[in-house]
């Protein structure tokens, strides 16, 4: 499909061998026509979503759109280095020790694992705290095969250790936040400085804090089962809103299934069984809205693969 441009404010970051479905491109073009949208960027993993595309970033002025962030605020990747030796890896033993981690953690269990509980967050009783969730969310142990730039890695990084990658989201909190705002205001943008915008931003921040805690709890319960510990090397959201500056203009950057390229180390996961890449973005890129792909993309809707 190539690194082509439609109007000057629409960019798709892809080469001639990248397959992107037509519906996703159509959604991107439609979204670019919303009032106050200045620029949009589609990533190589661009695909169609529920009305708005996934794998894209949108930059607007004076207004922002909760619907562009979607119903899983704060979904993202967290990466831990464990104390487990890669050379001594015994998958069957680790799987047996891990057992079932689909049951929500009680407040006592949360306190025992982290010394923190999710009770201060809205709807915390309904959020299945400490669980990964469905869809394409996962937690997986990884081994390091190749280090290309050791000088760019944290000093404590040890390629002889097993690494844990957790991909999880808001466990229903983002859905409840989005539903309330859509019921009250529809899909139109919220004016910055308005009461509606302030309410959403406060709830958005609470969701970001919750998902960070939840990913820590997921890792902590896994480490507890394996009788080991780990150090978090990064925790980066790919569904979120922030006020920032692009090309000298201050506005609102919406990322939906899109990894920030201006926050240090990030993980780009591959398809199941394929390689994932720990990368450090090295330069400011206005065309991509300082954003990278958040995964390998997909050719089919999840429902078609069941």
Pin down the residues of each PLM region.
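Short histidine-centered catalytic/ligand-binding loop motif
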Residues: 80-85, 205
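Domain-length cofactor-binding catalytic modules of enzymes
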Residues: 2-27, 35-41, 48-54, 58, ...
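Long, basic N-terminal domains or extensions that often function
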Residues: 109-115
């Amino acid at each position: 499909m190539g690194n082509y441009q439609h109007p000057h404010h629409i960019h798709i970051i892809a080469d001639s061998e990248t397959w992107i479905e037509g519906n996703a491109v159509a959604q991107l073009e439609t979204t670019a026509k919303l009032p106050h949208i200045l620029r949009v960027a589609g990533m190589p993993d661009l695909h169609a979503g529920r009305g708005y595309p996934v794998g894209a970033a949108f930059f607007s002025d004076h207004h922002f759109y909760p619907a562009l962030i979607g119903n899983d605020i704060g979904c993202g990747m967290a990466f831990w280095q464990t104390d487990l030796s890669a050379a001594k890896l015994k998958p069957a033993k680790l799987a047996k020790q891990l057992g079932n981690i689909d049951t929500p953690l009680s407040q006592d269990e949360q306190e025992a694992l982290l010394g923190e509980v999710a009770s201060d967050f809205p709807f915390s009783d309904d959020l299945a705290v400490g669980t990964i969730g469905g869809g394409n969310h996962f937690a997986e142990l990884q081994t390091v095969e190749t280090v290309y730039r050791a000088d760019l890695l944290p000093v404590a990084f040890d390629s002889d250790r097993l690494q844990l990658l957790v991909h999880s989201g808001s466990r229903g909190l983002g859905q409840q936040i989005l539903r309330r705002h859509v019921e009250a205001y529809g899909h139109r943008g919220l004016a910055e400085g308005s009461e509606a915008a302030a309410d959403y931003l406060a709830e958005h921040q609470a969701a970001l804090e919750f998902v960070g805690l939840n990913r820590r709890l997921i890792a902590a319960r896994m480490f507890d089962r394996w009788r080991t510990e780990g150090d978090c090397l990064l925790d980066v959201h790919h569904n979120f809103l922030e006020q920032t500056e692009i090309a000298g203009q201050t506005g609102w950057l919406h990322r939906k299934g899109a990894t920030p390229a201006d926050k240090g180390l990030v993980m780009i996961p591959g398809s199941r069984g394929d390689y994932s890449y720990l990368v450090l973005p090295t330069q400011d890129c206005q065309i991509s809205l300082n954003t990278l792909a958040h995964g390998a993309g997909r050719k089919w809707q999840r429902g078609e693969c069941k």
